[in-house]
Amino acid sequence: MNFITLLDYVGTFAFAISGIRLASAKHFDWFGAYVVGFVTAVGGGTLRDLLLGLPPFWMQNVSYLVVSGFAFLFVVGLRKYVIRLNNTFFIFDAVGLGLFTVVGIQKSIAVGYPMWVGIIMGTLTGAAGGMLRDVLLNEVPLIFRKDIYAIACICGGLIYYLCMYLDLPAAPTQFIAACSVILIRILACLLYTSPS
């Protein structure tokens, strides 16, 4: 398993938890909670693949269904702690956002698209799953609220390409870019509220 695949699976796990956790807090049944988690985990990547002219990734590899299932078991097993702690959603959402941004950029590079497409696809991969989650839960999507969400993905994409320009190896580039998205998202929520 290469580093980008590991990021993809960890991102799937984290985003699925964020969706399942919110669905459980809204008293969805188990099947509904799993569906929300799965859509959160694969929604952005599915839109990305369709725009890039590729078959959706999860239709070629059952492991994404399995990873989402493990996320479901994690939330069910620790539901008393996961649902009650407000910051659990935020933490898993930030991690998924950062990791999926990098996965989206890397996939765009692999099929030969230029930098600006990579940044857009990274942002879409990171943010669209959360947007679909919020729509399913009848919430205003985070991307449209005062939170710094898509901007964090764009900044991470720029950092990714800066690392490439500096000839850093692939794994450190991916790690730095993912961490930058996570850090920007966390700092923005802790320290800053965007203008009304």
Indicate where each model-derived feature is located:
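Cytoplasmic-side transmembrane-helix entry/capping segments in multi-pass membrane proteins
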Residues: 32-36, 62-64, 86-96, 145-151
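Small-residue-rich segments of transmembrane alpha-helices in multi-pass membrane proteins
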Residues: 37-42, 94-106, 148-161
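Conserved small/polar residues in nucleotide/adenosyl-binding loops
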Residues: 192-196
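Loop-to-transmembrane alpha-helix initiation sites
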Residues: 61-65, 114-119, 145-151, 169-178
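Ordered, amphipathic secondary-structure segments that act as subunit-interaction surfaces
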Residues: 71-107
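Structural signature of hydrophobic alpha-helical transmembrane segments
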Residues: 2-10, 57-69, 115-124
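Short, structured motif recognition centered on aromatic/hydrophobic residues
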Residues: 35-39, 46-52, 120, 124, ...
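Helix-coil boundary and interhelical linker segments in multi-pass alpha-helical membrane proteins
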Residues: 1-3, 50-58, 105-117, 163-172
